[in-house]
Amino acid sequence: MKIMSVNSGSSSLKFQLLEMPQQEVIVSGLVERIGSNQAVFTMKTKDKKDKQVLEVLNHQTAVELLLDALIQKKVINTLEEIEGVGHRVVQGGEIFSDSAVLTEKTLAQIESLCDLAPLHNPANIISIKAFQKVLPQVFQVAVFDTTFHQSMPAVNFLYAAPYYWYQKYQIRKYGAHGTSYKYITEQMQQILGKKNAKIIICHAGNGVSLCAVDSGKSVDTSMGFTPLEGVPMGTRSGNIDPAVVKFIAEKENKTVACVIDDLNKKSGYLGVSGISNDTRDILANIKEGNQQAILSHDIQVKRIVDYIASYYVLLKGVDALVFTAGIGENSSFFRSEIIKRLSVLGIKLDEEKNKVQGKQELITTFDSAIKAFVVPTNEELAIAQDVLRLQQNQTNQDKDDQQECFCCCG
């Protein structure tokens, strides 16, 4: 069956159409700059990549555009061939501990969580409604970034703030990148051949977070109430003394919202280096001896190592350390800088194997006390797998209900 994975932002819509359960990517694409007359629509099949600039004023138009293109390019013959759609939704709060079939009730619950993710959930909802309008009979599912972390114990997800903040406003650590962590966890259970594996995962892209996993469950993670908490990233500061916000607001004559915006969009690599938020630019400048670039990278690496060491103690040892996402999968320098700072744990890097880019590989030596792996993530596939799983569950439930009705009526 054909399932579409969708990841929408406020001005973008990324999609991938997969044949399931074969896990075959049929087509992928992206609509950028939604809301302008200079939107960019890119669609890629196995053989060809098309790109066009055109007017796309809203998400509804973007959805209709991409679905029309699938038919025009003969990727599919009719829309009826699409049997499921999975939507990435950033915030599921404490309501959702698993992906959920999209119903009126589910959508209303997602809307109720917009206060917790004002930059993301509204855009996710707009995209969901757009797909529901064009594909009203198609089975659709919300896959949340936060559900994987709902297994964290209170001691790890609560802040030491007034407790009523949590009771009244749900102020707590929610984490992010959960779909990626779930996928990597399942991959590592297969690689290691054990369900009760203790794993530390470093998801490093423009957004960076870490997760401690025990027996397939998230125990702790670095991102918090929002993705701003944790380690420094491309443009995010990571952990910072909250009093700095008020101090800078007064000194710079800015609102609190503006200072938070600076911490989200003008900090991290970009803020410290003054060069770029892109790791490739930072690494190029490090090679040239740029001290600010070196400092920005060292700060990030130091904070990542802090989390790994903390999670090692939390888990009472680990079976594997895993690097994934854009930087984690492709930067040998990034990985080596982290691993060499972990030598006290007996982890030993294999320099030759560490040259790998974008492929699964064990990158430590045979006598390393901890195994370290590069494992590519695949969030689109993970979303499609959840759609397939929930659809099969619903089909089985319908059969059980019919059987029960038959027995009662008979």
From Swiss-Prot:
Keyword Nucleotide-binding: yes
Cofactor: Mg(2+); Mn(2+)
Superkingdom assignment: Bacteria
Keywords noted in UniProt: ATP-binding, Cytoplasm, Kinase, Magnesium, Metal-binding, Nucleotide-binding, Transferase
Localization per record: Cytoplasm
Catalytic activity, EC: 2.7.2.1
A biological-process GO annotation: acetate metabolic process
Recorded catalytic activity of this chain's protein: acetate + ATP = acetyl phosphate + ADP
Site description Transition state stabilizer, residues in chain: 177, 236
First-level EC class: transferase
Residues at which Mg(2+) binds: 7, 379
Binding site for ATP: 14, 203-207, 278-280, 326-330
GO MF entry, a single one: ATP binding
Gene Ontology CC terms: cytoplasm
Binding positions for substrate per the UniProt entry: 88
Oligomer and partners: Homodimer.
Family according to the record: Belongs to the acetokinase family.
Role description: Catalyzes the formation of acetyl phosphate from acetate and ATP. Can also catalyze the reverse reaction.
Name of the protein in question: Acetate kinase
Source organism (scientific name): Onion yellows phytoplasma (strain OY-M)
